[in-house]
Amino acid sequence: MKVMIVEDEMLLAMELESEVEMAGHQVTGLAMSSSQAREQINASTPDFAFVDIHLMDGPTGIDVGRELKAAGIPYVFVSGNIKKIPEGFAGALGAIEKPYTMNGMKNALTYISAIVGGDESGSPPASLVLAEDAHVA
């Protein structure tokens, strides 16, 4: 699975990149702002994205999420305060709250990979809060 990471805290982005690669997936790019994320969406066409809500250019992650949804790319918010996510999760599959454990992220990534691959039979891990209408179109 090709994964895009949208996160303005470089250390967290690098840790997540490492976790994604150790799980056998390819990171198509790291974006720290909404403009970088838009470039990545157009340049690499990821299969999935992790998106922080607050980026270098402000609370623009929700807008990035909506652009991903419009492009048909499933995503999950990664945020320190998931209560700031709009009702319906702005089209996201769900959210992972920071701080997260590497084991929690690994379990979420395994579940997400199955969902993106078309297998919706599994149960979500505790680390992943699903949107009520979460499904991949």
Task: Describe these PLM feature segments.
Residues 101:
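Receiver (REC) domain switch/active-site region of two-component response regulators
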Residues 98:
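A Lys-centered signature of the CheY-like receiver
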Residues 10-29:
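Two-component/phosphorelay signaling modules centered on CheY-like receiver
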Residues 30-48:
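Acidic, metal-coordinating helix/loop segments flanking the phosphotransfer/catalytic sites
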Residues 7:
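Conserved acidic carboxylate
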Residues 116-137:
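CheY-like receiver
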Residues 51-69:
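Conserved phosphotransfer microenvironments
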Residues 78-79:
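Hydrophobic/aromatic residues positioned on beta-strands within the core alpha/beta folds
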